[in-house]
Amino acid sequence: MKNYKKYSGEELINLDEKGNAIEKDKEEKKNKFNFKYKIIIPIIFFILIIVCYYISFHYKKNIKNVFDETTIKNLKLKNRVFLGPITHNIEKIEKIVKNNISLVVTDGAFVGDFSISNLQPEKPFRIDDDKYIKEIKELADVVHKYNSYILLDLFHPGLMTADKPIYSPSADKSFFNKNLKSKAMTKEDILRMEDYFVQAAKRAKKAGYDGIEIHGAHLTLVSSFSSIKYNRRTDEYGGNDENRSKFIVEIVKKIKQAVGDDMIISAKIDSVDEEYGFTENGFLTLGKALEKSGVDLIEVSGANPVRKDKGPYFFNDTKKLADILNIPIVCIGGIKSYEQADYILKNSNIEYVSLSRELLKDPDIIKKWYLNK
């Protein structure tokens, strides 16, 4: 069928061979369809690219292996396994690091106003005076001999104290001696304690440590500032989650200023535990505040690290924190097998796992994991 055109008024009208007008809307529909096709297809294609990129990025991010080589700041780690804070005994640590542990976090070293803590069954580990630099350096040298790295855990027991002096954010009884009661720390007490942590970090640097960890878990002094149960202050260090984070944030900032950017700064914090006053909002707020303050690493533990239930104890909360932060997060607590470590890494944004008791019991466990993986 041939088409003819006839000029009618202001427009050309398509005619068939008998002179009848062809329906104008057919051509208009075709034009509209072509127009929509040209617009919609590129949009759909663009959306598919974004979705595929997101899936690919997320998938690659979680394809992590226990034995990946990684980097934190200037440290090139040989795998994703740490030794957590459980001992400062040189012989015990050497047995562990010679079997390929990438990073060691020491047992808690007292930073100042020394007092006995029931948390340490071994000889108290001290960093509250320059005379201890030589002693702690021996441990760092042993770890470095095996191409591993070491962080010094900086610690004050707070209410975990069996004798005086005793410090806490609010007046409370000692956990180990009910006849002992602390007074609420004054602003001067807080600033002095912050300086103890700073001086301890400077000593760690002189001793050749690769970094420090601020021990803010297990209801120690720093930990108790984050608890709504033990921190009942109404000043700038209490009253809301941001204020309760201030003590450890100030410590981080002052340490960074004192030791520079070449040292790793890690923070160990409590997961959610309503019984001890650690709320979910407080936990996440603290994590964000620490990231903003400049920490390189966060390790998540709990107010009560000794559990009877099957581990990993703190995985769910650690996973939540890893989902909202852009710094490496470490999962610790009850990790006993390669399968558990592998599951944690592949099913979250958690970057590292830390073992303590299992490595003390079996220093060869990482070598066995590697051979049997």
Residues of each region from the PLM?
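N-terminal targeting leaders characterized by basic, low-complexity, disordered sequences
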Residues: 1-26
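Flavin-dependent oxidoreductase catalytic cores
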Residues: 19, 25, 53-373
